[in-house]
From Swiss-Prot:
Active-site residues (renumbered): C142, H235, E237
Record InterPro entries: Class_I_gatase-like, HST_MetA, MetA_family
Protein name as annotated: Homoserine O-acetyltransferase
Native organism taxonomy: Bacteria, Bacillati, Bacillota, Bacilli, Lactobacillales
Residues annotated as binding substrate: K163, S192, R249
GO BP: L-methionine biosynthetic process from homoserine via O-succinyl-L-homoserine and cystathionine
Amino acid sequence: MPVKVIEGLPAIDDLRADNIFVMNDERAKNQNIRPLNLLVVNLMPRKLITERQILRLLSNTPLQINVEFLYMTSHDFKNTKQGHLDSFYKSFSEIKSQYYDGLIVTGAPVEQLNFEEVDYWSELLKIIDWSKSHVYSSLHICWGAQAALYARYGVTKENLPQKLCGIYKSSVEQPKNPLFRGFDDFFNYPQSRYTQSNPSEIKKVPDLEVLSSSKETGFSILAKKNLREIYLFGHLEYDRETLAWEYERDKEEGLKPNLPQNYFPENDDKNKPKSTWASAASLFFSNWLNYAVYQGTPYLGERLSQHLNEENYDFNQKEQK
């Protein structure tokens, strides 16, 4: 799948070097299929790296995707130059009248704070509420998933005994769900978090299904039955080196982190980590784009605002595109 982004985005060169199809404006104008319009709320501190990770996963199907990035104006980002945000990101006030086929809300390293203590919490609440009427399918990652569950259903989060960090084998609980078409019974899934959404409170939300779980991680992927809301408690988007970087960062900050589980060969952090989840990540995001987004939205983009009220789309009946 080609992704179309603003020309000059630093991630473009890295993506092309990795054989990822990135499309410029001129070529995009000659496409005959309707592109999907996706919004990425990037809450991660290393924004350029997260951009590349997300775009890589969006690029692997035959569809064209127009990707826009959103940042929180109520937060001072120390690791990203304002010029980069001005050039390649939009604020909520700039996009709130628009409609999107899909939304991705990333994680953020703020999970040890209460939700209301996060300085951009009010702004994020507005975006989550806005998405109900302006986005067809929303995918939330790690803290972004915990935040959305709290905002929408009042599901609180709780501290884990220690940081859950490493690569864990997760079981596919709903193999017939479209998001898991083509999956094996288990897949490797990066985790990096101190908290979890309260499992007993999740069970009380009748519209949510547990799609994946493991003994070590608990619930790992949830979704509404109509796939309009999807919650990933781990980081399928992570690169091979991301957990290693976080481990070194935590050591430098004096946090005395445990070694990420099932990650470094022979449990030696001097060894290069093995990538064991990339194919599952690519397949999951492709399934999301195809079955939850593309198959559910109308061919004519201007009809999306009317279509958003349809809550019971049958994924066995494809719309004509």
